[in-house]
């Protein structure tokens, strides 16, 4: 009797399905454990909820103003979630779609590797390396960000471009560019690779030009239009190197060393090593593909925000696709040793995951990554918080601390505590402040003292540090 052996394609589908199941479960558990927050999970929930209720991409900003999501980031792909929200109105919907999308990115990696490396087994190894790549896994767990969907879309776009199928490439590239304003620059980099690496100069030039044009329009026209004529609020992160795209260009000519110092600090070099080591540096053998990673690297390395030079956040979304695609084409340069090279990359990804990845089980292994290892653990405190939040009507204007915000943002107005303004309900967690809450501990504490003494507010719930107030006058 003939023994059945699964094909490499079947195995990569199985690996992707297992990965999606695991990371969808981890994402939902982190949400139930209140490890997500108003920033950024709640922002996305409110934008999707508003769209589903006839107010496209409306949300409440930090100061209590009702604005368009496009005033902060050009990620209109959020609109696609509105019909899904009608069917399943839950933040879990966004988390599951994100895990599914990122996991399916393994398929274009497999197709690309099978074509160029010439070995289905090697292609399977490289696809699994993508799934084990620490930046990929942290991306899937960093709350919900539409830009995470750009990673699989960019991989799909690169596959179609490599095949010379420009129409489906265009569809995937446009979809990716709708995930965030700077993703268009990655698409432009793909155009440069296509023009020089595939000698399709006209088509590649058009792709590069369109990518640059849309990215520039999104940043300099769309965001200011929805931001009351003001430039992006995130320019402050680049104040040391010019404070704007134009200022950065001027700094490059007037004080070039300032850019070098900003982009290659010890923190930045550590970030680059965390991106490079789990791919065994094989991507260096395909330098033209790496052109697509340059804009995103510049955006992250020049920023003063430490989150942008950490693989734990979503800022790697535009980097993963060109780095992994370059690793595949780099491995193809060593086609004669395809299986051993793929094995080395897979081993590097596994070791990188052990040292840097988010899999909770690593904390039980000596030297394994322990950062956020218990983030998916739902505690008694979380159950108390969930019970407290059920007291708040779904149509009420709420002010809440960041750690509770992701569970309360599916409404027209949501205020970030300690801002109160027109709120009729307030929810706060005194014992477990979320990431954003730590920026203003004193105003938060003072506001809670004021609420306890104010006769206009009644404390209707207090247990284990969870407080819920209702306006009575």
Model-derived features: positions:
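Signature aromatic-anchored transmembrane alpha helix within multi-pass, membrane-resident enzymes
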Residues: 13-17, 121, 208-212, 334-363
């Amino acid at each position: 009797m003939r023994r059945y052996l699964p094909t490499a394609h079947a195995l990569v589908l199985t690996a992707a399905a297992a990965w999606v199941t695991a990371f969808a479960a981890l994402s939902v558990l982190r949400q139930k454990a209140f490890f997500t927050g108003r920033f950024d999970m709640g922002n996305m929930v409110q934008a999707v909820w508003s769209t589903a209720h006839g107010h496209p991409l409306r949300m409440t900003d930090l100061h209590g103003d009702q604005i368009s999501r496009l005033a902060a980031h050009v990620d209109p792909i959020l609109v696609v979630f509105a019909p899904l929200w009608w069917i399943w109105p839950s933040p879990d919907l966004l988390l599951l779609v994100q895990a599914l999308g990122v996991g399916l990115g393994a398929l274009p990696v497999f197709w690309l590797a099978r074509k160029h490396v010439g070995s289905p087994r090697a292609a399977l190894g490289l696809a699994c390396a993508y799934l084990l790549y620490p930046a990929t896994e942290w991306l899937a767990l960093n709350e919900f960000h539409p830009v995470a969907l750009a990673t699989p879309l960019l991989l799909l776009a690169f596959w179609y471009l490599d095949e010379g199928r420009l129409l489906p490439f265009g569809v995937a590239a446009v979809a990716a560019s709708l995930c965030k304003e700077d993703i268009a620059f990655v698409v432009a980099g793909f155009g440069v690779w296509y023009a020089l690496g595939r000698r399709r100069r006209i088509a590649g030039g058009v792709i590069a030009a369109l990518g640059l044009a849309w990215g520039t329009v999104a940043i300099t026209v769309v965001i200011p239009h929805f931001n009351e004529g003001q430039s992006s609020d995130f320019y402050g992160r680049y104040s040391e190197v010019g404070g704007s795209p134009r200022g950065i260009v001027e700094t490059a000519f007037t004080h070039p060393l300032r850019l070098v110092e900003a982009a290659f600090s010890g923190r930045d070099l550590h970030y680059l090593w965390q991106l490079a080591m789990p791919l065994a540096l094989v991507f260096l053998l395909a330098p033209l593909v790496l052109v697509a990673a340059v804009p995103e690297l510049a955006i992250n390395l020049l920023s003063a925000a430490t989150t942008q030079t950490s693989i734990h956040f979503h800022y790697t979304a535009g980097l993963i696709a060109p780095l992994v695609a370059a690793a595949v084409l780099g491995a193809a340069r060593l086609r004669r040793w395809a299986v051993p090279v793929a094995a080395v990359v897979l081993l590097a990804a596994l070791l990188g995951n052990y040292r840097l990845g988010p899999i909770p089980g690593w904390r039980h292994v000596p030297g394994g990554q322990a950062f956020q290892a218990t983030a998916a653990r739902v505690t008694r405190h979380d159950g108390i918080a969930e019970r407290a939040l059920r007291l708040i009507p779904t149509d009420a204007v709420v002010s809440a601390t960041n750690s509770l915000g992701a569970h309360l943002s599916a409404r027209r107005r949501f205020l970030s505590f300690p801002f109160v303004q027109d709120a009729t309900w307030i929810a706060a967690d005194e014992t477990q402040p979320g990431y954003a809450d730590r920026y203003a501990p004193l105003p938060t504490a003072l506001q809670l003292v004021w609420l306890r003494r104010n006769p206009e507010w009644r404390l209707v719930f207090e247990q284990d540090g969870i407080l819920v107030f209702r306006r009575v006058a």
